[in-house]
Amino acid sequence: MEFTTGLMSLDTALNEMLSRVTPLTAQETLPLVQCFGRILASDVVSPLDVPGFDNSAMDGYAVRLADIASGQPLPVAGKSFAGQPYHGEWPAGTCIRIMTGAPVPEGCEAVVMQEQTEQMDNGVRFTAEVRSGQNIRRRGEDISAGAVVFPAGTRLTTAELPVIASLGIAEVPVIRKVRVALFSTGDELQLPGQPLGDGQIYDTNRLAVHLMLEQLGCEVINLGIIRDDPHALRAAFIEADSQADVVISSGGVSVGEADYTKTILEELGEIAFWKLAIKPGKPFAFGKLSNSWFCGLPGNPVSATLTFYQLVQPLLAKLSGNTASGLPARQRVRTASRLKKTPGRLDFQRGVLQRNADGELEVTTTGHQGSHIFSSFSLGNCFIVLERDRGNVEVGEWVEVEPFNALFGGL
């Protein structure tokens, strides 16, 4: 793996990362209740038709068209309930009382909802036109036996798992979780809940990354804070590499910090690239250790979170076998705020996407965009993506926005 100098574009960096990794193949079979957020290892094929029988879409009356042609009231010959179908005789000139989900009796040509009927002394009168097949759910209408319901690579959520259960399937094979070893570096870091020493700050990056990893369904190996010592850092990399598919560090990759980090990484593996043409997030490193992939996040909180979101998230998705993109589609809107920008790097500013008084989408800035201001994520709901060569943006100009996904409480 050749080390690339200079500033690499985001697209080039992401393509470089994704081109090198291959999805995990190890799998395990789990009951559905344990499969939320997991990735299907093989297609789910339906063993049966859904629904498995013709049934009523409404509470009402099952009828034959010939019986209602005269317009006369029809006596009720029986009742059909969900789980208790009607099996008795169905004489000509009568109807069957039927409930939603109940099997329609043999010979039924339509179900008339009860709101379109009138109870008479001598039976039920139908007050609206009746069409053949109305309000009948046909067997296999939703899913037919033998159909691929969900392909391998699908991330399982509450949208998919109940469907699988409706097929009578109790467990499915899923790709094993991606194992990620995580640590922060720096003498200045302190654990939340502990008193701060002179010049110290609390370690927030590791918490943010840990939470995002759990949301993505990873198995997290949290190695804590590693002090600014080459021997300790080398030992941490060796331990992490022995346990994980991906090693993520926070801090230690900026200019002035990176000398011994780079030396250790080159000793233990290879570095693909070190610096990106994005803001925030310029000091991001990617490479390969003996057994795992390495992602070095910047120390500034916004920079660390942004590079994880834009680069590490897609990498983990590919490793896990997830075939869907985790990033919402970008869209063009007008800005209602003036945006400060210096040409030279792709800029991800935090913004608020909302509709104005005319019902049109527009975006406003969350305020100061410093790479240390993590509150911009809680205030915003999108990134304002400003092109590399673009300068300051005036009110009313068109910009590209990318709504936050579920990692930040978005889509």
Curated annotation (Swiss-Prot):
Q: Name one GO molecular function term.
A: identical protein binding
- E.C. numbers: 2.10.1.1
Q: Which UniProt keywords are present, listed alphabetically?
A: Magnesium, Metal-binding, Molybdenum, Molybdenum cofactor biosynthesis, Transferase
- PROSITE patterns tied to this protein: MOCF_BIOSYNTHESIS_2
User: How many cofactors are bound and how?
Assistant: Binds 1 Mg(2+) ion per subunit.
Question: Its catalytic activity?
Answer: adenylyl-molybdopterin + molybdate = Mo-molybdopterin + AMP + H(+)
Pathway listed for it? Cofactor biosynthesis; molybdopterin biosynthesis
Q: How does it assemble?
A: Homodimer. Interacts with MobA, MogA and MobB in vivo.
Name of the featured protein? Molybdopterin molybdenumtransferase
Species per Swiss-Prot/TrEMBL record:
Escherichia coli (strain K12)
**What lineage does the source organism belong to?**
Bacteria, Pseudomonadati, Pseudomonadota, Gammaproteobacteria, Enterobacterales
